[in-house]
Amino acid sequence: MTTVYIADTGVFVRCGGPDKDKFQQLRRALRQAGVSLRIPQRVYEELGGDPAADEYPSGNIPYPDGFEEGWIVVADELDYANPLVSTVMDEARRFIANETDRDEDSIEKADPALVGLAAQVLDTGEADHVVLLTTDKPAGKAAETLLPKHGFSDRIEFRYVSVEYLETLTATEFR
C-alpha cells in the first residue's frame, strides 16, 4: 500500500523554525521512516516560497533544509480540469465555511487545496491511502467527510497536529 502524507502550513508554523525541537523531531521522524511531506503549491506560497520558481526551495522560504533534504516536497499543480478535483475543492470550501460559520469567500485557498490534492493523488492511483497532517480541524474533517463520498472510503486519515503530537512524534507514525 502506498501512502502519501500531505501537510498544511500550520504544521510548520506549529513546529517553529529549524532550530526548534519540534521541527527537528518532525525532520528526524520523516527521515528515519524514509517518507516525505507533500505540500500543495498554495501551502508553499503561504510558507514564503515563489510559486513561479523552476526549482525548490525559492523565495524567502524559512525551511530550505526540508526541501533540500527531500522530506518536504511541493506537489505538482492541482489539475482543476479534473472534475473530481474541482468538485472536491468546491465542496471542501463550503464544508469549511459551514463548520466555521464564515463566508465561503473568506476561506483560505490552501485549505481546499489540501483536500483537492488528497483527491488527486487517490484518483490518479499515485497513492492508495492519504494521511492529512494539519492544525486545521475543519479542513481535516472536510477531507474525512467528503472523500469517502467520492469513492475513497477508508483511504483518507486526518491527523490533528498538536504541540503534543509533534513532541512525541516518531518514525512509527509514518510506517
Region spans (language model):
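Short, flexible loop segments at boundaries between secondary-structure elements
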Residues: 155-175
